[in-house]
Amino acid sequence: MHPDLSPHLHTEECNVLINLLKECHKNHSILKFFGHCNDLDREMRKCLKNEYMEKRNKSRELGNAMRKRLFNPPEESEN
């Protein structure tokens, strides 16, 4: 099962692969059951996985920065 394949959620590279896979399924409605579109599917899943990993790493970095800011507030200088 794939995640939501809406175009606004993915990069242009992945959107191209998603559209190619959809086109393959549309043009080869019977052969898709025998693996005709599997190569496109693998490439699309690889692209989606890379997107997921990038988003996860970015979120982790933002979370670490926020934790650092919350638990280690800057020292206020006293006059």
Swiss-Prot record:
Q: Where is this motif: Cx9C motif 2?
A: 37-47
Q: Where is this motif: Cx9C motif 1?
A: 14-24
Q: Which PROSITE patterns match?
A: CHCH
Question: Which UniProt keywords are present, listed alphabetically?
Answer: Disulfide bond, Mitochondrion
The domain of life is: Eukaryota
**Using the chain's own numbering, where are the disulfide bonds?**
C14-C47, C24-C37
Q: Supply one GO CC term from the record.
A: mitochondrion
First-listed, main subcellular location of the protein, grouped into a coarse class: mitochondrion
- Enumerate the residue ranges of region (Disordered): 58-79
* The keyword Cytoplasm is assigned to this record: no
Concerning InterPro entries, the annotation shows:
Cyt_c_biogenesis_Cmc1-like (IPR013892)
Q: Could you tell me which residue ranges the CHCH domain spans?
A: 11-55
Query: What family, per the record?
Result: Belongs to the CMC family.
Q: What does this protein do?
A: May be involved in cytochrome c oxidase biogenesis.
> How is this protein named in the record?
COX assembly mitochondrial protein 2 homolog
Phylogenetic lineage:
Eukaryota, Metazoa, Chordata, Craniata, Vertebrata
